[in-house]
Regions:
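Structured, helix-rich domain cores that form ligand/interaction pockets
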Residues: 1-246, 252-253, 276, 280-323
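Helix-turn-helix DNA-binding segment
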Residues: 248-251, 256-269, 274
């Protein structure tokens, strides 16, 4: 990827939602916070107590929050308004946003590369992308397993331009060994990304296997899907991430491609396919982690979310949960 383009990969982080589990039913949420929480009551089984899973969006209280301190204040305010004082965090989402309307299209292939590396590294089976029904433009790429989810999506399209974010990269943790969000998103996720970066070659192989199947299926189709190898590669260029991968793909067709290296070089020169190095992917990872650290270390408190002000909404001050 060109350096002048990569430098525009800039993200702002924040907690999107937090899910907590509490005992008993949550059925008396005060009106001041009811738009911030969605509660699902689970009846007890075989003598077990009833429990409630509550999904909290702290940004709906006073607007988007860009520091962990103000996020905690908002979450505690919402919990107090819902009458929840004893709970366990069972899921949390962190968002990485850009307001740039071009950001999603500019970096969707780079983000796809990174997300694919996570899928390969952790052998994730639930991996998919979505497209607009009519334009066929990519809307999202996501992978999900028991422990985590990661998704990059066109936020402008999803919100119809109503959200300040135009592009969103989101990571979700669904299994917590410790109730420590900072550690989860700055340390646990760093280990996941580091592991993913070691599997880029396997990403190439996974895509090449799929592309080979698509090529043979296209040749066998009664309708013409492509007229040549060049046509095919242009159709699927978003699944080819580097010169090495393209050469290895072309080597699978010795009867059609006599000189894969020369073919790959000419294809790049003529059609300007976008390639990435491991350094490019690492740059994206470092920006994601930088944005996360900035969020957790920020001390600025948004106006209207100051300690004391929010508690005035309720008769009883919520207990502060130690991290």
């Amino acid at each position: 990827m060109k350096k002048d383009k990569l430098k525009n990969y800039i993200l702002t982080a924040g907690i999107h939602t937090v899910a907590v589990k509490s005992q008993g039913a949550v059925d008396d949420v005060q009106s001041e916070v009811e738009q911030c929480i969605t509660a699902s009551v689970h009846p007890g089984r075989k003598g077990s107590d009833m429990s409630t899973t509550s999904i909290i969006n702290p940004n709906k209280l006073f607007g988007d929050l860009y520091s962990f301190d103000e996020c905690c204040t908002a979450v505690q305010t919402i919990l107090a308004g819902a009458g929840i004082d004893d709970y366990q965090v069972i899921r949390a989402d962190m968002r990485f946003d850009s307001p740039d309307l071009n950001h999603y299209r500019e970096f969707q292939k780079l983000n796809r590369y990174l997300i694919s590396a996570l899928a390969v590294a952790y052998k994730v089976k639930n991996a998919y992308c979505s497209v607009n029904l009519f334009s066929q433009k990519q809307l999202s790429v996501a992978v999900k397993n028991k422990y985590f989810e990661i998704e990059n999506y066109d936020k402008a399209a999803e919100s119809h331009g109503k959200d300040a974010a135009a592009s969103r990269f989101e990571i979700r943790s669904k299994f917590f060994c410790e109730q420590d969000l900072k550690k989860e998103f700055t340390e646990v996720w760093k280990k996941r990304f580091d592991k993913a970066l070691k599997h880029l070659d396997e990403v190439h192989g996974a895509y090449n296997d799929a592309l080979e199947d698509l090529y043979h299926d296209g040749l066998a189709s009664r309708s013409v899907r492509f007229r040549s190898m060049t046509d095919f590669l242009l159709q699927w260029q978003d699944c080819i991430f580097c010169k090495k991968q393209l050469i290895e793909f072309l080597e699978r067709f010795p009867d059609k491609i006599k000189n894969p290296v020369s073919y790959a070089e000419n294809f790049k020169k003529r059609y300007k396919i976008e390639y990435f190095s491991e350094k490019d992917v690492r740059f994206a990872v470092e920006e994601i982690l930088r944005a996360a650290r900035t969020f957790f270390d920020a001390k600025k408190v948004q106006e209207g979310v100051q300690e004391g002000v929010e508690y005035a909404l309720f008769d009883k001050e919520p207990e502060v949960v130690q991290s």
